[in-house]
Amino acid sequence: MAGNNIPSDQWKLRGGTAWVYPANGVARVVDPVIVVAEPGPGPTDLDAFADRVDGPDYPLRTKLAQRGKDVILVGYDDKSDWDTAEQVIEEAALRTCAMRFGSKPMAVVGAGRAALLARYALARLEDKRMSHEVGAFFSLDSTTPTAAEQDALNTVGAMPQLPRLGKITSAGTRDLEGLGPRDDPASSQFDDALYASGPASKTSLVNEEEGNWLLERLP
């Protein structure tokens, strides 16, 4: 594990793990941003994920810490199907809410399939009348749901209703909704959208344009 990736705390979740990086060295969570890893063929390599979140093209974790944001990275203990991965994200959101000092709204960030799963997890919590206290959700280059996944989304209202919804689509990536910068923003299910001028970073979770856009829209 790289020295700068060592978390201040680790939370054991059912089917997953969260690495916790409080801002400014304060050993408590006050203003959290949850960043969700994509499920893979085996356990999440959270060390590698931490490298990507704080990658050379845009060190998002460092930038968040500079703004006083506490970062929680969420991964999975093993290969995770839709239901298992979604439950890990649900528990991570609820644990963060319970461990947070104060009442600052949280943010959730997911890329690729993680964006789709986080979207479903938040909508499902709302459908169950469970408070997640997430003020903003950011979907980065989300995968398109399969027919079965879309059916699951539809059963919980398709989108979370309480957070402000942000969508980032990198250049050269198919937009989740099939939209682009010339389309009417009102045709999107998201409140804000960035159609980035550059491609997705190969070394970082976001490129500079995407990272700056995200930071300016945090609650």
Task: Label each residue range with its predicted role.
Residues 1-15, 30-31, 66, 70, ...:
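Extended, composition-driven regions rather than compact fold-specific motifs
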Residues 7-76:
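Short, surface-exposed "cap/lid" segments of acyl-processing enzymes
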Residues 14-22, 152-158, 218:
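A Trp-anchored, charged/polar loop motif used as the substrate-binding/catalytic surface
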Residues 32-36, 70-75, 105-109, 136-139, ...:
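Structural recognition of the beta-strand scaffold that forms the well-ordered cores
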Residues 39-42, 77-81, 112-116, 142-146, ...:
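Solvent-exposed loop/turn segments at secondary-structure junctions
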Residues 64-94, 98, 106:
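Well-ordered mid-protein domain cores that form the structural environment of catalytic cofactors
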Residues 154-219:
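C-terminal catalytic-base region of ester-bond hydrolases, centering on the histidine
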